């Protein structure tokens, strides 16, 4: 028997096999971060193909943390209908779902996140999206760090 195809447990979660898909950027969300039909089709194809656990690509816990165009949003309840539809389709195909929560920090760009990028320190660094640019993020205050932590907690609750 091939152990790869046998069920496994992660805590109380039972997955149908040990094939796990890691998060990979697809840029299939719309410009605001809503799940689209293309997003659902992409993940559904992997679930139908036999993946036991799919980790959906990085979703930003706050708008200021979006670091790519067409990145999934999870920073507001308005994203829940699309995310719920995505998870329901993955489950219907027999797979389990998780999601990667991530804040772009100093790798965000004002034209994507809507404000000056933030990071633990204001150290310039190169970022490549469609062109190479140097980003100098705003140094986070203790209050801003606490706000990002709270945003992650709220996003985890939505997930």
Can you say where each PLM-predicted feature lies in the sequence?
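Flavin-dependent oxidoreductase catalytic cores
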Residues: 1-158
């Amino acid at each position: 028997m091939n152990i790869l195809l046998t069920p496994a447990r992660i805590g109380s979660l039972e997955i149908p096999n040990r094939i796990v898909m890691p998060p990979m950027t697809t840029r299939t969300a719309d410009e605001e971060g809503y799940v689209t039909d293309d997003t659902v089709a992409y993940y559904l194809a992997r679930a139908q193909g036999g993946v036991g656990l799919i980790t959906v690509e990085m979703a930003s816990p706050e708008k200021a943390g979006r670091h790519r165009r067409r990145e999934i949003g999870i920073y507001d309840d308005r994203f829940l209908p699309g995310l719920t539809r995505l998870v329901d389709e993955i489950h219907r195909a027999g797979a389990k779902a998780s999601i990667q929560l991530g804040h772009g920090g100093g790798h965000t760009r004002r034209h994507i996140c809507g404000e000056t990028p933030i990071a633990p320190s204001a150290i310039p660094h190169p970022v490549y999206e469609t062109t190479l640019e140097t980003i100098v993020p705003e140094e986070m205050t203790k209050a801003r760090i606490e706000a990002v932590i709270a945003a992650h907690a709220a996003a985890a609750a939505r997930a």
